[in-house]
Amino acid sequence: MRLYVVSGSYHPEVGGPSTYLRRLLPELIERGHHVSVITYTDAKNSGIDDGFPYPVYRVSRSWPLILRLVLFTINILWRARDYDVLFVSDYGLPVILANLILRKPIVLKNVSDFAWEYSVRHNWINKRQTIDEFQISRHGWRVRVLQKLRAWYTKKASLIIVPSKYIGKLVSGWGVSPDHVRVVYNALDYSRFDNLPSKADARKTLGYSEKLPIVLTAARLVSWKGVDSVIRTIAKIRDDFPRIHLMVAGDGPERRQLEKLAVESELPVQFLGFRSQENLYNIMRAADVFVLFSTYEGMPHSVLVAMACGTPVVASSIGGTVEVITDQVNGLLVPAGNEKALADAIRQLLNQDSLAQKLSTGAVHTLQRFSWDSLIEKTENSLLEVIN
């Protein structure tokens, strides 16, 4: 199979698509497939990136948006003409336009709702509107155009890969037949967790005492991740745990507002910014509780990482999260936005070592469902399916 991969970002840039493709593509090559990639770069000039054992072409982001999209589309049209299938990871429109001429089978990996995320980022809708509310609410003309565009290019794909049943239902709501949707869960490379330090050693390396209550949240700092609620919640339970320490890993447009909220709450919050995977694993290992209090998750990769690190998880019962966590078995689920329930759950885990241990043990069994072998097998089968 000759596979042409289209992605908005690629290694060494950070982010989900980059990490996913960096691991997936060598595995597909190992299985005898030929791979080529087109993506973007922050460098001034476009061109071939020689740093990979397969062709990677980068289009510069320095061009104005419309011209950038035109160049990206033209390059797909020119470079993908001899390939069997187009595999789109997070960047659908240019490849669909190019394919009006190429007429190739397309597999689209869809992990969210582009129209919703774009509308939130550009303040076209209330930033507190959830992804589910967005699907059924009345919107202005700009949002409606974006929704129609998203539905159009999604329906043009031969097959859509989604990371959870929840996202599958979301996509079906745009007019896509469920027969064209394949659920392929995210995965972890468990070998990366084989040599993790003990909790005590991780804390020693990071400079924290063994008795310090540490709560960690790791997420892109955008409104739907609920980090503001986590800060307020930790401030409320500080009377019970005077030395409690909150760490926030990740960065994003909400960071300045969150830092201001931490100061107003008189809470010592440590904003860590982006961290390497290995460093984040050590931080996860040192934490007593990992919290993900989002109002939306397609498939929470950070929850899988926390589980692999042996850190008990508290998460909001939404989206793909409920496909990973079973309440009181491998984590604690709380209603989205309910800060009182979140506070109670964190208190439980900080006060009950036996519960924390029970959840960590339950998580070990859960992780078996999220293996790379399974992801690669199902992804390869989906790609071959559209050819055959």
Briefly describe each language-model feature range.
Residues 312-315, 325:
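Short hydrophobic beta-strand element within catalytic cores of glycosyltransferases
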Residues 327-328, 332-339, 348-353:
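Conserved acidic donor-binding segment of nucleotide-sugar-dependent glycosyltransferases
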Residues 166, 187:
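Carbohydrate-associated surface elements
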Residues 154, 274-275, 282-287:
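Short alpha-helical donor nucleotide-sugar binding micro-motif in glycosyltransferases
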Residues 259-275:
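Nucleotide-activated donor-binding/catalytic signature segment of Leloir-type glycosyltransferases, i.e.
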Residues 295:
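Aromatic "clamp/platform" in nucleotide-sugar-dependent glycosyltransferases that forms part
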Residues 6, 209-225, 231-234:
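Conserved donor-binding/catalytic core segment of Leloir-type glycosyltransferases
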Residues 74-77, 81, 130-160:
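Membrane-proximal helix-turn-helix segments that form the acceptor-binding/catalytic region
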